[in-house]
């Protein structure tokens, strides 16, 4: 009689993880390990970007800051900034009502500037033939008194005269210069002559690239900030060695200060109501800072810095481990003991904690689990490289900042919004499809690795062991721990055990043949006995029918 056979089984790791992923074919597949690649959290603060503070304008607008609204004095001189923060509806904008020409274009320009240096180009004291201090308004109060924008000068007539102005400034700096000026549009003709003496006036501005002539538009208007008049402001970039020339006989708002663009770089004007959080980040959104190495986020579509890509998804999880189907109980099943990971295994091993794939053996010396370190390490390297590759490919650094349009460009704004929404939809679809496909490939990859490990053992053992169909092999010979180890490390000596295996196979086959012979003898005896009994019954019935006349019997 044979003793209980030694066995070796191929299996895979399982744990208590409840992480779930989606694949092309399935949803909510529980896996042993997974990695979230969608950032969903932020700190709710405005932070320094790579150590450089933002310029947070608080209650001031960009126009209020650049022109010098008296309520924005804290921004008269500002250090280098990483990005600019402006509220959606800042209180301190153009205190004197009017318009800022090409304002949106100026903001776009600021998205490529990190530092201004304010310099005086035409001193206020140089206007000896005009009144340079009387140009103030109650619309721009400071300390309870009428005031005006700090960086421009509202020139008024002096001694009932407004001589024609001819003034030039040559940019001798090495940097570009942002120059601002304006025109006043009075409420009526009386205000025109009261302020400028001349009833018909103009302003001419010229550079190597600019040729502008402005005339005031006198009209009756509703009061804003107590004013019926309006002011319109303009700007230009004056290149090094270029000159700007002004000529006017009235209504001129002259530049006193200009901004030297001393540092260009990636910046942005971000609309946000948040406060400064005394923190540092690599990625800022209007909702708060993101500190993450993930390739995607769903916090806000507008960002500045080294940011993940925005997608509309709520969940993006990459499978890194295996299907997690722990073996619940050890019982015989038609398809074996373990799990369907390789088509024939029905459950993972929680007892194997030091690897993804491995072995369980049992012999007279005992039983135990052992991970296959080589295949596990190769799999870990492969999955890690794949995840890192996905992150690297998707984590291209870029900015998505809001674009502003004036009232005449609403159709362009709507078209731009539709295009951006379309791009976001495409990115979201691509990200979700990428995750589904990679998860399918990862789980198939693990399946393949388990199958390869099984084939490695099968090819070594050949007919020295029997495949049980559940990931296990039953040896036809004694296999001690040294023998088991040789199977695991691929050095199993088939010839050494082949004779013992052959004898045991033959003994098992003999028992089967003997059982089959006995079965056949019993079958033949049973068939003959049944046939004889049937013949006797037929003969008896015939004799009885002949004796009572029911059947005529003739013997020839």
Curated annotation (Swiss-Prot):
It is a single-pass type I membrane protein. InterPro entries: Capsid_hemagglutn (IPR008980), Hemagglutn_HA1_a/b_dom_sf (IPR013828), Hemagglutn_influenz_A (IPR000149), Hemagglutn_influenz_A/B (IPR001364). Disulfide bonds join 9-472, 47-279, 60-72, 95-140, 283-307, 479-483. Its main location: virion. It is found in: Virion membrane; Host apical cell membrane. Homotrimer of disulfide-linked HA1-HA2. Binds to sialic acid-containing receptors on the cell surface, bringing about the attachment of the virus particle to the cell. This attachment induces virion internalization either through clathrin-dependent endocytosis or through clathrin- and caveolin-independent pathway. Plays a major role in the determination of host range restriction and virulence. Class I viral fusion protein. Responsible for penetration of the virus into the cell cytoplasm by mediating the fusion of the membrane of the endocytosed virus particle with the endosomal membrane. This is Hemagglutinin. It comes from Influenza A virus (strain A/Chicken/Hong Kong/715.5/2001 H5N1 genotype E). The gene is HA.
